[in-house]
Amino acid sequence: MIKNFTDLEVYKECRQLRINISILVKTKFPLDEKYKLADQILRSSRSITANIAEGFSRYYYKENIQFCRISRGSLNETLEHLITAFDEKYINDEELMNLKTKIDLGGKLLNGYINHLKKTQKPKEED
């Protein structure tokens, strides 16, 4: 039974992604990227879970869905930052592919959650 956003499978998976990215940034990114790429990727990965949490607390399904869509955008933004990190040689191909797999899973789970919310929302009352 889902009582809180922390019970959602999509949140759990995206939280683990956020943790993995945080560790990666702290261990692999050079100091001169601290306020550049490192900051951007940390912000985008944090936005994924933050928007899932915020959407869950909204009273209306449509608002929750909108926050999930923002979260999905943050997933893709995070992937772009990871590709940039790969291009700059901060991470290797294996690290990029591992994180891309996690991002893809997060996207699938988000899409499933959005579809669930769409099916669950009450139909519009007819006038």
Where are these regions (language model features)?
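Amphipathic alpha-helical assembly/interaction segments
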Residues: M1-D127
